[in-house]
């Protein structure tokens, strides 16, 4: 008698899904997720959500629409997602979230494994709670964000060899402001990215700068 295959419940964390986020990491993670679903596994996607302009807004987990059959949960008011633009204000990236909220999420879903694809946007409490609940955790590093604030480990067209991080501030001189980070994780920006006719119109019309060049506004 053939041994029955054991299906798993897997929580993937990545910095977003198309059309709001794209690139190799997103392609790899979503392809993996789709294949896991095809094989009968239960897959949950956990992504950074919208950031409120309200001061001291608390993290909240909200269920979103299915993505290729996977259940999606947003962490609203999580840490900013700098992508590959560097960090200007370190305090924005070291805030804590409600540990009880994280415990509640894991206890409700009881995942067999927690698969992290980037540290961008992820509060440290997710790692601490996963460890305390003895949830096996996998980290697939698609970038260098854990050791490089730009996530590229690349400086002046060469691999950065500054092992003591003494020159990071020079690479981060053009990092996004707090206001721009919030705009790019706002409801308005999500609406913009999800509507192809709007994005196409903006990119084809040089006189419109609101979304194509937000830096000019900030």
Where are the language model's segments positioned?
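Short, flexible loop segments at the rims of nucleotide/cofactor-binding pockets, characterized by
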Residues: 89-94, 115-116, 218
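A conditional alpha-helix N-cap/helix-loop micro-motif detector
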Residues: 25-26, 94-96, 119
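Active-site proximal beta-strand in glycosyltransferases
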Residues: 113, 130-176, 180
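Extended, charge-rich helix/loop segments that form flexible
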Residues: 164-218
